[in-house]
């Protein structure tokens, strides 16, 4: 991005899931007479997470879905409650597939452009009806600004955060039930706040296992990892030697 910017119709601040989905839709739908930019601080995208959702309606990600489950479970107090739907599925999209689809559409657009390595620092309305956006590479003006970034004020005021660490685990023997996703297993230690394990079973020998908390404070990485280790041992009688590939 150069220091001299032209006016645009729409500026999207932040290229996370929300910002990318909005920008991909703009890239497909904006008429040639209009323009949009996406400002994202990171320099590139990598497979850093998974995206899961209920397929209540078509959100344009069908070709990215890698796994679907029509059964899900909740475990609490030593009892497992399993539900099933013939209508809706719980869907899993790998981060790299999601990013590839979004960026491919944006990169191929004549109306929407992605600017990586660019941080929006300040947004101020102007008397012209435009908004001026100050970035670390200069200024841009836009008729409409969609800020998809978390509000620092809201984060600071929040009394409860959701925070987690997940492992992608492959095992030497079958231990997972690939027909049922574990949305919440509360039969785990609770001393650091509301805590549950979340399991996406891709096969009998492969799953994503996450230690998830709702609490005020984020914990050290080793705390989550120790809970995941303990869960693999206690829930699946799985030794770390049998977990041959952990990411």
Can you describe what each PLM-predicted range is?
Residues 8, 33-34, 143:
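Nucleotide donor/acceptor-binding cores
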Residues 21, 25-79, 97:
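N-terminal FAD cofactor-binding segment of flavoenzymes
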Residues 15, 25, 29, 105-239:
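Predominantly flavin-linked oxidoreductase catalytic cores and closely associated redox partners
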Residues 2-18, 37:
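Beta1/beta-strand and adjacent pyrophosphate-binding region of the FAD-binding site
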Residues 18, 94, 98, 220-224:
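Short amphipathic alpha-helical segments
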Residues 238-247:
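Flavin (FAD/FMN) cofactor-binding core of flavoprotein oxidoreductases
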Residues 57-89, 96-97, 104-108, 122-127, ...:
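Flavin (FAD/FMN) cofactor-binding and adjacent substrate-gating region
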